[in-house]
Curated annotation (Swiss-Prot):
This is Cell adhesion molecule CEACAM3. PANTHER family: CARCINOEMBRYONIC ANTIGEN-RELATED CELL ADHESION MOLECULE 19 (PTHR44427), CARCINOEMBRYONIC ANTIGEN-RELATED CELL ADHESION MOLECULE 3 (PTHR44427:SF23). Residues 35-155 are extracellular. Glycans are attached at residues 104, 111.
Amino acid sequence: MGPPSASPHRECIPWQGLLLTASLLNFWNPPTTAKLTIESMPLSVAEGKEVLLLVHNLPQHLFGYSWYKGERVDGNSLIVGYVIGTQQATPGAAYSGRETIYTNASLLIQNVTQNDIGFYTLQVIKSDLVNEEATGQFHVYQENAPGLPVGAVAGIVTGVLVGVALVAALVCFLLLAKTGRTSIQRDLKEQQPQALAPGRGPSHSSAFSMSPLSTAQAPLPNPRTAASIYEELLKHDTNIYCRMDHKAEVAS
C-alpha cells in the first residue's frame, strides 16, 4: 500500500499570498485629495474691467472661508469672510465695495484698478477646524497703453501713410499749377511786341505819350512874323488880272 497523497488544499503558494496582501492594502488606502488652487480669469485684465478668482478642489465639510489681500492671512488685509451655515458675508478692512464672494468660495472683483494688482489668499476653515490656504494673483493693464493689438497698429500705420500720400499729392498739384501759370505768362510776354529803346524810333505808345510833351515844347510863332504874313495877303496884285485879259485877247 502506497503512501497517502497530500491534500492539495493544504499547500500555500507564496505569490498568491502577496497578491492578496497588496489588494487589501490598496483597498484600505484612502484616496489622495486634490490640492486647493486658485485660477485668475483672466490672468491679465484691462483697467476698469472685472476679474474672477475661481477656486478649484474646494474641500468638503467646511465651516467657512475668507479672502485676504496679499500672500498671508492678516486681519488688516481681510477683504470678506463667509459663514456657510448662516450664508452671511462679513466685509473686512480691505473691502472696497467692488468685491463679491460666491458660495463656491470664488471672488469677483469689478472695476479693477492698478492698486488691485498683486496676490490674493483664500483661507478655508474645515468643520474639524483645520485650515487650508491657497494664493492666486492677476495683473492689470491700461487699455490705451502702448501694447496695442497688431490690427490696431496696422490700422494706425495705414492711416498715417494714406495721410502722407494725400499731402504729397496736394503739394505736387499746387507746384504743377504754379509752374503752368508761370509758363503761360512767359509765353504771353514773348508774343507781345517789345518797346523800342529811346532814340531808335517811335512807337504807338511812345508817340501818344510824347505828343503832348512835343506840342508843349514847340516854339510859338513870333507875333511880328504873323502880322507881316497877314499884310501880304491883304495886298491886291492888279497885274495878275491884266495879264489874264491880255492873254485872252491874243487867243481870240
